[in-house]
Amino acid sequence: MIEIILNGERKTIDPQASVTAVLAANGYDCGRVAVAINSTFVARADYDRQKFVVGDRVDVVAPMAGG
């Protein structure tokens, strides 16, 4: 297991977990969020291939509607 920081919270994940798997495990809809790892945008097409390393800082951003 490895530790990452997901939106400011420490999370322990499988070292082989993809972005898709981590998002799903934490209640995010992969089709409705943007992801950056260590301030670098991850293309949605890469979610299944992108892996994490110890200490990665992961930011998940969802669009908000407002008026």
Regions flagged by a language model, labelled:
Residues 1-66:
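Ubiquitin-like/PB1-type beta-grasp interaction modules and other compact soluble beta-rich domains
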